[in-house]
């Protein structure tokens, strides 16, 4: 078999020791040459059309080359010993190869290894991707280099390019990438324009404000991302992947023949969307058939494989079962790659994504597949052993036949059990195939039952050739077949070969009684050579042998015309050629018995074809049709032609598919009979399902459609879980899982897929006693149901199907039993316990990599809990996605003196390292890991933080901020690259009164006070709320009377920040309205402002209190106007649409709200749980609260307990939960009748249904926040349309000039009374030369000025105070520094002359404007306001710790109190709180036992300001008194 580029392995080390050429007599036996190596040869590659071969020794990092097909070997000595890190062959030039090192100097050859030249990349190889080099299909000199630049522990991927084959140093293409590709990445793909084919590049680009893959975008450039001649903007654009709009979440690009595929993902799901183009201009989303007969056709991450496709269609295999014992379905696309039809069900796959599928080389329409015969049993139970059968098709998958040897069926080992390199069965040798298989009903064991079979008629018939499993190869276009027995031992001493298509075989001993364990048998890619390479392992050292085998001496003669035959790919019983894919196909081939060799090295056989007339065999079922009883029957909606039925009525008709189509690639000649038989037929518009047309429009009714479901139960509370779908989800359903319950009893579990229109109890769950419902933290399609025993039931498809596994232990009592990985859906951690007796239990942690099918114990016992902290989102060197952090006892015993330690592992507990001792708790929040350690002597806490989960640094609080006894830390939402840490500063015993919120620097180690006297409750929850969807906006309630007696009631006031805590302000009062006058009017001050009820008064901690992530800037809250917050019973309902700048009262009293259609629908209702009132009506607004209408939903007043909708705010459906005279009910309210069409975005403001809205900053008139102004799409209030689910509200960002707000005080500096950063007395500035060590590519550094740039800012230009000081050269860059700062004669003249000319004017200006601040650096253009004493950087000092520690990934977690907060039933284990950990808090400290019940998590885990929250997953108290009732 040939070594293909796609199957190249990594590099390996080898030291050549000796070689022994052994000649054989002519016409007697082959010639052998052997060479010994110490290490295994890897990445074995032939230069195409040559005898030159090279391999890599991965152990010693060397490359070896042979120019005579392995007879002699030499190390490539142009590369220093031990420096060859990676070997890469050029994909489109047979003379070129590249050896990459770990540094920035690499090596290339353009003459098949005869000479090697150095080239510079300037950047390191990327650690995050294997595809470093990307080649251009037309121009071999055009190459992309995917590398990275690291600053400390923070790494950014960077792409470079060359257009001269690295003859000159590579140039930077773009930063912040996740891989770049040439558009012209295959011979067949073209953009349709020569200049675009040459230059067009596609890059996956990471969002500047978000590390998450769900925010990555595809950007295209035709000038290498440079600026154009007439603009300073970079020339790049984002293509409209989804017809008329771009799509974010791009994760990968693949070029398959003439198609380019882009895969996207989104939050809440691992389902992917595939977008396909034939020219990078017009894109389509790949559409798969409707699910039927248990076939799940969703394309999931790491669950689909692009197979070897044809020039006219794409073939993809999609995994449809559990990963531990996978099966799949193979699909084939239409000619433009858009619509896929099911081709082969129940394909055999393995855990690595390999599929038992292979096309027969050179013969159109013939391929072999392995299917799972007992697929139903395997789908039901993952431990069932597969019964695999082999089949072959000769019509591109329309029909399949058994593989037979004589009259017996045989089954063949295929791609999932690769035992050699290259294709499994076939080669360019026409019609010749070899395989390992067995006779019987299904495929058996390779080693015990496998034999070698040969076919010389393209797989129609097979003959047994040799007993036992063998590695095999083809030579001289099939004139010679070579095989070597496969073995697990070093006991193989001979090879076998055949010169007559496998009818007879000759054995030949290896030289010098050599015995090997074979690893690879290979030859040139064309299979036209008479030379082969055999690689095997031997017992003695050196351990590896590379054996060159030459058969050139067996025949002297070269084949003549009489020795050849015309071989037809398909013949009938009489031997006459038959049509295959619409034509006959024949090849010239050497006759079996001819005693000659073709000796046409490096040439491919050429076929001859002749078209036939079309028959029924040339047609297959069209999209969404499947064959039943010989006919194609509809299994899903019809796809209409472009534009059809867009404005039609359901009964209108059009010409649509008959259900049949000609097989793609079939070349048969059309006939009138076949045309008439399969022509388009009349179809109704009601049958369609998208495509180029559109569903018939439904006129707006301007009415709310409502559907009630009454439950004959005695429930008094609900548990409900919204399964938020992702943007890439193919399903449009809105799924909710719920159950009613009483104080002592759990009700049955109900599921709806249409937002409460219909409910059903899943059969799989009916008989189970389920105590917890736990949605997957990151992938909302997956939900776990924990029973009273060890049985865990789960669904991966939003409740359509169910599976189960056995938990390794009982769940822990005080932590969430399941921990999830943010990128790997099937990676699970089980936090369990083992009990020696009822009162003698200890923690045990287990992990699974296949969704619970198999479990292994993680580390030692007495482990309290573990969680995944690895993530693709945060890129740091050495960071592994397998990283796990655990809290465990230092000793494996119940000893009293047995403190907790924090351990980490990167290899599934094979190795563990203690990171911190005396640990009270740890929390993950965005990229940070925050740990609270305990000082046992004085019983206080110390916080420390890490970015990589390995190196922790103590948190340094601001100079002058002293808390005598630190007992409680609460980690708040930290989604803007800084930790928000609440430190309790006033305690009443162990109960929290109030404290300060401190904000960290970018590595979480040094803090500045953001706001003080913040209210907290007895559980250490804090009145702090980030506003969903906006960067840097948050609300707090502060205690206005901190000096009052402890028995005095707190006087709370509300403050808001619009710049992430740098400045806080009171809320302005609303204007007086029809309801009445307010007691005072003010723009917001301590005596008169609007005050809102906050987080500590919330019953459901996970709920979004004020806002919805997609209704940007819209907030609703309860509160009052005055000097402080009053009782909630006296509060009214207020609303803002400008992110809190202005407010208005919308209802008197406390009304519960829900926001839908991304702010287009707002519903208010009085709920019994809040106001103790019954009702029969609600009010709603369709214009963002400008006007309100009343809707009566019941004839009699009922109790309404809640109103809910999707947390994304994207739905037009709402659900009322309540209780009437007939019992508990749900009432679905459908608002779709108020709109007809999807809102459209248009560059023309008059045509667009949206306008651009930017949040304003109350203290910054330019509206800049973090150096930019954000623009959001908002629907115009007068437009009668609805927001598409896939609308991205954030439309764009515009950078601002740098001002004072973009800089903070540097290390050991603090703000002085003049508002300037001054050195803290007694401290020293940081060593400025450390900058060079952290940034090795920089050539200079500045002396400290006292200022540094805020990491989050994107500002450009303006003042740069961190650089307004003397500059010095970095060590080793002195020459570069001198060149950069060399002064020309003209510049010197002006430098001397101009200061004298300006001295008088400057002196006059200084005299006129002197304000006593001379000698200090002053920033910005705002004047004195910049330095006012009430600015936070004046009031609070800032001290910045040098970045000696950094760390990686922190992920939201659901633990402790959240687990217990939903318990309290059935032994304290009630409905679980799942969700995604957003909007939660992490509390460090408090009671004993590692924090106990008072440790919770609260993290939006947001992406650049998209502050989402958890699902409504906690048990909700209904119909009885609670802390929210007044």
From Swiss-Prot:
Residues 1407-1437 are cytoplasmic. Residues 25-1385, 1459-1526 are lumenal. The chain crosses the membrane at residues 1386-1406, 1438-1458. Residues 1484-1493 have a biased composition (Gly residues). Glycans are attached at residues 311, 336, 938, 1003. Functions as a sorting receptor in the Golgi compartment required for the intracellular sorting and delivery of soluble vacuolar proteins, like carboxypeptidase Y (CPY) and proteinase A. Executes multiple rounds of sorting by cycling between the late Golgi and a prevacuolar endosome-like compartment. This is Vacuolar protein sorting/targeting protein 10. It comes from Chaetomium globosum (strain ATCC 6205 / CBS 148.51 / DSM 1962 / NBRC 6347 / NRRL 1970).
